[in-house]
Amino acid sequence: MSATATQVKLTTSLGTIVVQLNSEKAPLSAANFLKYVKEGFYNGTIFHRVIPGFMVQGGGFDTNFEQKATGAEIQNEADNGLKNKRGTLAMARTNAPHSASSQFFINYKDNSFLDFSGKNASGWGYAVFAEVIEGMDVVDAMAKVPTGNRGHHGDVPKTNIVIEKADVLE
């Protein structure tokens, strides 16, 4: 990714993470994430799903575990050549390939089974749009937080991991 690529700072309750967007290969996903950052949408949201050795997911629930209303779903860009490698961010979605909105996840390891393999229901994969360039130690610390069930959700941190503020770095 180029040195002029947009960077976003996520100030969390466990420390700071800086990510660099790849607007060249993932223009829709990067623009979508940036829109939510600029609107302040992620401020006060939590990382609600932590699976050590796999990924940590956030961007959709507030500290009361209420799901936030989102904008329109976006087209899946997982066929962009970017891979779900350790430290990359990808758009979370439902089983429907083109259902991503605000939620994203950070890969703890190379998760090649999440990569694009074909334009069919099982092959679309998950669109990578950014990578952690600072604070991977913070992401790794999230994996050490005890988790449990909350409502119908599993792997939820017992203590909220909050995105206190998301800022575009100029």
What are these regions, as identified by a protein language model?
Residues 1-170:
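Cyclophilin-like peptidyl-prolyl cis-trans isomerases
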